């Protein structure tokens, strides 16, 4: 065989490998879109961790057109509200413009004006060119030539007024100062004052909008005898250049769908999307539909090849030759992708880019399918396996047949890139006209003319003379001087902008008049010097700096105040909560209720990863971080004395589940059964519905009581301990229960990580958390992230049971952790929605703990009331100034109301994290905005071994939560899931807006509408030397692959600015901020130092306010014993 033939024989295999590699890389740009039941907060931009935050925003915007910052209008509102001030903007400009901010632009009366002065004004004020009509509106409606602009600082106003007075002692008026300035601006650009009546201004607009020849052409209905202003050869050369530029974009910036949209105005995705979504939803369904696709078990692409399209309601009959093409599809999806790309005549060098382009056109569906592809053990994959290659093959197939239809109907040519290029090279006039029309840049009269021509039959469209005439008119309009008005100096653009800028700079008319035209142009050019991405990043940093200054000031002023820097005194009780920001409030309230309590923060699975099966659960579910794979299974079982009772419970429970299945499924799927059931059950269901609508809290309470009466609860225990048989537990060989060695190992590691190895109180409470609400498809997003989007109660219960075993305490003592005999551990769970707090296994608590437990439960109940009260201030529908009981009732009602789109606010407003002893933050009101994770630097080694583990595991978890909320709040349409009100649950695995939308991932609008999007600022109680050593030990770079990006490398997060790091010295309380290029830099506030307010209770600081509150120091009535850190 010749070398040429050998190369040809090998090329299909080479192409397969290239495509497989290319598809694997797509996870870098696709969201990690887990199904609803496994929803997990992750960084929406996780594929960009290897570059900086700012670079990632720019790259993602270039790829998708989705902006990653708040709109500037929103930032300006925050500025107006005082959430950002001038000092913050100055600091941000100084830190993020690489020294350009200090460049002197000009000096006026000895006063230097630098770029920072101009940039700050351009950020705060909207100083953009106006259209003539908007300019007229400003003059007429706002008296813009008589009054100062809104937002002009008092110092600038005084400067302009004083300059006017110096010129004429009798004319120190605002109106005269503004007129002098306006006339000076006109003189700089040598333009006349348009002092016209409004009707005359309207005529001026028309004259600037169209040239005289175009106006005449319009009035004469576009006479074809219009003179040619540009040689034909030049016009064709320009059109040919545009054509080649557009065709060259296909594969990187455009798909063929985008190319056709640029030439026809039609979006093929509107036709492709409903078919693609209906099929994919049917295949991926997790229990919603009554009928499943045949061949579903063979995979997504295999099911597509054998799909009964008519039965599924997929209308393809109108498309040309789809059946023959479908019959020719190869067996493997990768071969189908190759066949489609070759049929579309996409050059091989652009295949990777082309696949990326079509994948990000529907990122939600692509992301979910990619998620399932990387998790073959995911239970629904057993019935319906899938892969991203399968999805792309189907998408390309649909693109091919729809593109063929458009090109055949429009131009009578084959639907591929080469045919389109060849056709328009022969019909450059038509290309020029179409391209200009669908770029949406033409004036109305030209757009109408081109649209009329497109509406003609195809044979008439090909008339070169018709298209030449229209293209000639378009070229005349483009190259007429009046059409290039943005490059010319005009009153409503250049003069207006200089006029506004001078007011804010405090430049009076006599100083502006000294400027040359080029100097004025330079000033205006600086206004536009910052790119959109740079402006967004500068605003974001200013927003973050404002919060940072308050936060750092609070930590600094609190140094030495907080209790429990050491445990020389024994606390009355210790409560370990998840480090979740929502638990910061209840911890603070507990310490205010009883200052002798100590609270700690820890990952909410408490170091006990399990596959959990509750008493009535048919299957196990993982309760641990998503990056951890449990090797132990834990079952809840009835206690020996309740086994007989459990038999009845099980029968009644199964019967109840059977009735629910009949009610939910038969009424939707079976014609006869549904008719009977609806007639029989209608009166009762009407009463239930009325209760849910008008009395949700009472209805839910009645439902719980009825369920308890019909299916009596059973006392349970954990099947916790098993003997060590020498077999290693693995993810594929789960151990049911834990050996003594495993229990001691997990407890010791956990207690050391949170710095809790001594000073145990008589009662130690571990509180997991979760959230219960009605009609909430994203319920898992409110649960414990450290427990994998599940409740943390089972983990807390398991830890407490382990820690109470004498055998385990003996093993811990061998490792230097001595738990006294008079200490008892109790597991609980905090419902962050209803503020309920069930306690586990209280009947096992020894009687001698009863008085202390009774007192502690009363204090916890009081703290829950206070927590509910604090939460109510951020909820628009909550009563204003509620009593504690009213607040508790309100938050409980929200969880039972199936119409409530905001049962709780989740992680909204989270902005910071603190890793250290409780003494660092105790006594500070942090407004439920801070992850508070316990760590004791005094028990760690010199290398920071414990701290390194904490940072590597907790850091990415906090970043994932924070950035999910950040992006969903900054651009909910681009990154979030839209409003819950319009969401439709699809296949029980996702939500869409409407019926044929992209699958919407991440947070809904109602979850983030009060969120202040900023990156998490993580302060670690450690020396800078220790943190620097840990930082240097981390891998400097790591490309995400195969799903490893779920736990991104710590150094990538820090280097890229995804996580903002600072250190607080354990002894001095001095704060240093980390910069990847310079290391740790001592923090020095750019504000004037001022003492924080001191209040007796948190309520004294937040009550009556609905916006975020800055930190304050809390000093309860009872005097605490202070221990220096």
UniProtKB/Swiss-Prot annotation:
Q: Name one GO cellular component term.
A: plasma membrane
Write down the required cofactor(s).
Zn(2+)
A Pfam family it matches:
DabA
Q: Which molecular function terms from Gene Ontology are attached?
A: zinc ion binding
InterPro entries referenced in this protein's UniProt entry, alphabetically:
DabA
Q: List every stretch annotated Disordered.
A: 1106-1125
Q: List the residue ranges forming a coiled coil, or say none.
A: none
Name where it mostly resides.
membrane
Localization (cell) = Cell inner membrane
Q: What domain of life?
A: Bacteria
Q: Which residues bind Zn(2+)?
A: 578, 580, 769, 784
Q: Does the keyword Cell membrane apply?
A: yes
Q: Which HAMAP family has this protein been placed in?
A: DabA
Role noted for this protein: Part of an energy-coupled inorganic carbon pump.
Question: By what name is this protein known?
Answer: Probable inorganic carbon transporter subunit DabA
**Species whose genome carries this gene:** Nitrosococcus oceani (strain ATCC 19707 / BCRC 17464 / JCM 30415 / NCIMB 11848 / C-107)
What is this protein's gene name?
dabA
């Amino acid at each position: 065989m010749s070398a040429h033939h050998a190369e040809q024989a090998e090329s299909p295999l080479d192409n397969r490998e290239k495509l497989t590699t290319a598809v694997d890389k797509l996870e870098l740009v696709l969201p990690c879109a887990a199904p609803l039941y496994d929803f997990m907060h992750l960084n929406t931009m996780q594929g960009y961790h290897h570059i900086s935050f700012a670079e990632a925003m720019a790259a993602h915007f270039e790829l998708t057109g989705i902006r990653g910052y708040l709109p500037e209008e929103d930032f300006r509102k925050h500025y107006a509200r005082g959430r950002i001030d001038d000092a913050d903007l100055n600091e941000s400009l100084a830190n993020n413009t690489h020294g350009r901010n200090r460049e002197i632009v000009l000096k006026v009366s000895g006063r230097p004006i630098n770029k920072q002065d101009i940039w700050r004004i351009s950020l705060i004020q909207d100083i953009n060119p106006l259209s003539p009509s908007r300019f007229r509106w400003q003059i007429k409606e706002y008296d813009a030539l008589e009054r100062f602009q809104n937002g002009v600082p008092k110092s600038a106003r005084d400067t302009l007024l004083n300059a006017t007075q110096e010129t004429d002692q009798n004319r120190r008026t605002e109106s005269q100062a503004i007129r002098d300035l306006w006339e000076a601006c006109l003189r700089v650009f040598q333009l006349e004052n348009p002092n016209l009546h409004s009707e005359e201004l309207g005529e001026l607009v028309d004259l600037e909008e169209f040239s005289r020849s175009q106006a005449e052409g319009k009035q004469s209905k576009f006479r074809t005898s219009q003179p040619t202003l540009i040689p034909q050869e030049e016009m064709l050369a320009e059109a040919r250049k545009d054509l080649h530029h557009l065709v060259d974009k296909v594969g990187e910036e455009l798909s063929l769908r985008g190319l056709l949209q640029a030439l026809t105005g039609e979006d093929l995705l509107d036709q492709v999307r409903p078919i693609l979504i209906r099929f994919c939803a049917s295949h991926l369904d997790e229990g919603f539909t009554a009928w499943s696709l045949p061949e579903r078990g063979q995979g997504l692409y295999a099911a597509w090849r054998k799909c009964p399209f008519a039965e599924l309601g997929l209308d393809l009959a109108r498309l040309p030759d789809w059946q023959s093409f479908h019959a020719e599809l190869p067996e493997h999806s990768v071969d189908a992708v190759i066949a489609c790309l070759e049929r579309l005549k996409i050059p091989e060098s652009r295949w990777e880019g082309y696949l990326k382009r079509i994948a990000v056109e529907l990122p939600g569906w692509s992301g979910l399918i990619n998620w399932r592809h990387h998790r073959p053990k995911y239970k629904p994959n057993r019935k319906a396996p899938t892969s991203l290659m399968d999805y792309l093959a189907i998408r390309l197939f649909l693109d091919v047949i729809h593109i063929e239809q458009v090109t055949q109907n429009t131009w009578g040519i084959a639907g591929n890139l080469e045919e389109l290029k060849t056709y328009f090279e022969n019909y450059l006039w038509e290309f020029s006209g179409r391209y200009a029309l669908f770029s949406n840049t033409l004036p109305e009269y030209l757009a109408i003319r081109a649209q009329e021509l497109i509406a003609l039959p195809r044979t008439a469209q090909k008339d070169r003379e018709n298209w030449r005439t229209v293209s000639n008119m378009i070229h005349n309009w483009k190259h007429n001087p009046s059409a290039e008005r943005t490059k010319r100096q005009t009153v409503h653009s250049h003069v207006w902008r200089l006029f506004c800028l001078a007011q804010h700079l405090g430049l009076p008319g006599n100083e502006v008049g000294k400027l040359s035209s080029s100097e004025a142009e330079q000033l205006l050019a600086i206004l536009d010097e910052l790119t959109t991405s740079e402006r967004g990043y500068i605003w974001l940093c200013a927003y973050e700096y404002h919060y940072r200054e308050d936060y750092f000031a609070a930590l600094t002023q609190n140094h030495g105040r907080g209790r429990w820097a050491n445990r020389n005194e024994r606390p009355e009780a210790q409560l370990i909560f998840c480090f979740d920001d929502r638990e910061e409030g209840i911890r603070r309230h507990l310490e205010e209720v009883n200052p002798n309590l100590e609270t700690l923060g820890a990952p909410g699975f408490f170091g006990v990863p399990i596959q959990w099966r509750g008493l009535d659960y048919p299957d196990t579910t993982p309760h641990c971080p998503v990056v951890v794979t449990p090797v132990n299974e834990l079952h809840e079982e009835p206690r020996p004395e309740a086994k007989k009772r459990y038999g009845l419970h099980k029968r009644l429970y199964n019967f109840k589940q059977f009735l629910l299945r009949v009610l939910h499924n038969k009424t939707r799927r079976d014609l006869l059964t549904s008719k009977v059931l609806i007639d029989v059950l209608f009166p009762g269901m009407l009463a239930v519905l009325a209760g849910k609508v008008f009395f949700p809290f009472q209805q839910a309470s009645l439902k719980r009581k009825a369920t308890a009466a019909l299916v009596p609860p059973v006392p349970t225990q954990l099947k916790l301990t098993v003997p060590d048989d020498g077999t290693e537990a693995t993810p594929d060989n789960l151990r049911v229960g834990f050996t003594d060695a495993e229990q001691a190992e997990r407890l010791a590691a956990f207690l050391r990580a949170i710095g809790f190895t001594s000073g145990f109180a008589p009662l130690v409470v571990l509180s997991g958390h979760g959230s219960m609400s009605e009609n909430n498809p994203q319920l898992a997003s409110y649960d414990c992230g450290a427990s994998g989007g599940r409740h943390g109660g089972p983990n807390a219960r398991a830890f407490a049971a382990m820690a109470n075993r004498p055998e385990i305490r003996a093993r811990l003592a061998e490792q230097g952790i001595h738990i006294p005999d008079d200490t008892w551990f109790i597991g609980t769970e905090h419902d962050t929605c209803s503020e309920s707090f069930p306690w586990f296994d209280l009947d096992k608590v020894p009687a001698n703990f009863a008085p202390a437990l009774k007192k502690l439960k009363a204090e916890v109940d009081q703290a829950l009331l206070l927590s509910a009260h604090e939460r109510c201030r951020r909820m628009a529908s909550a009563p204003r100034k509620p009593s504690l009981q009213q607040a508790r009732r309100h938050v409980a009602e929200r969880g039972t109301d199936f119409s409530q789109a905001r049962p709780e606010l989740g992680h909204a407003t989270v902005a910071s994290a603190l890793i250290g002893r409780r003494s660092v933050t105790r006594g500070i009101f942090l407004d439920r905005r801070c992850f508070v994770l316990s760590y004791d630097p005094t028990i760690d080694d010199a290398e920071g071994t414990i701290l390194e583990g904490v940072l590597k595991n907790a850091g990415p978890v906090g970043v994932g939560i924070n950035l999910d909320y950040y992006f969903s709040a900054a651009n909910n349409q681009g990154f979030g899931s839209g409003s819950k009100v319009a969401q439709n649950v699809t296949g029980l695995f996702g939500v869409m807006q409407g019926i044929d939308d992209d699958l919407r991932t991440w947070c809904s609008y109602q979850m983030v509408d009060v969120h202040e999007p900023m990156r998490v600022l993580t302060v670690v109680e450690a020396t800078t030397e220790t943190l620097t050593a840990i930082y240097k030990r981390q891998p400097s770079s790591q490309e995400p692959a195969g799903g490893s990006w779920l736990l991104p490398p710590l150094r990538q997060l820090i280097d890229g600015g995804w996580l903002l790091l600072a250190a607080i010295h354990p002894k001095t309380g001095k704060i240093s901020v980390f910069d990847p290029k310079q290391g740790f830099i001592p923090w020095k506030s750019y504000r004037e130092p001022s003492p924080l307010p001191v209040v007796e209770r948190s309520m004294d600081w937040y009550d009556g306010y609905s916006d975020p509150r800055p930190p304050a120091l809390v000093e309860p009535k009872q005097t605490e014993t202070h221990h220096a850190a």
